[in-house]
Curated annotation (Swiss-Prot):
GO terms for cellular component: chloroplast thylakoid membrane; photosystem I. Disulfide bonds: none annotated. This is Photosystem I assembly protein Ycf4. Seems to be required for the assembly of the photosystem I complex. InterPro entries: PSI_Ycf4_assembly. Pfam families: Ycf4. It comes from Porphyra purpurea. HAMAP family: Ycf4. The keyword ATP-binding does not apply. Its main location: plastid. Belongs to the Ycf4 family.
Amino acid sequence: MKQVLPIHKVRKDVILGSRRFSNYWWASTIFIGALGFLLAGLSSYFQTDLLPFANSTELVFIPQGIVMTFYGSVGIFLSMFLWLTIIWNIGAGYNEFNKNEGIVKIFRLGFPGKNRQICLKFNIKEIKSIKIDIKEGLNPRREIYLCTKDKRNIPLTRVGQPLLLSEVEEQAAEIARFLDVVLEGA
């Protein structure tokens, strides 16, 4: 999502973090499945039905019950990790290109701690080009990079599902045109 202020000298692209539908889906699905495994394993240990729709007391605790308890515990921890990344909105932020101040600001949220907020600032004069990196195949990658004169490539696109090729090209061209720099492909 881009936002160009009326002065047309400031461009701000909002970056979606981990609060996407797919993350909510996987965190919920893993939690429900892991809870089922954990309750089935505990049912076999305590010989009490903790799952109302299944008879888990017939499971032998060693080896089936203990394995299900282990997988359930691991799944619960994985889902908690996913829920925490959603709550903390890891990866969210913005790219701000400000011609008035001559600064490019890249801001992202990280994990809690010393580096929770990551803010990179560059002088517009330090920017050499905007680069598009496209790799097709089983794990496609379509990314836009801000290339500086000291040969650093800073990613501008969000992490997750790749954007459509036309969207990547259009967004990169708009940024390059706004900054008056070269657009290059990889």
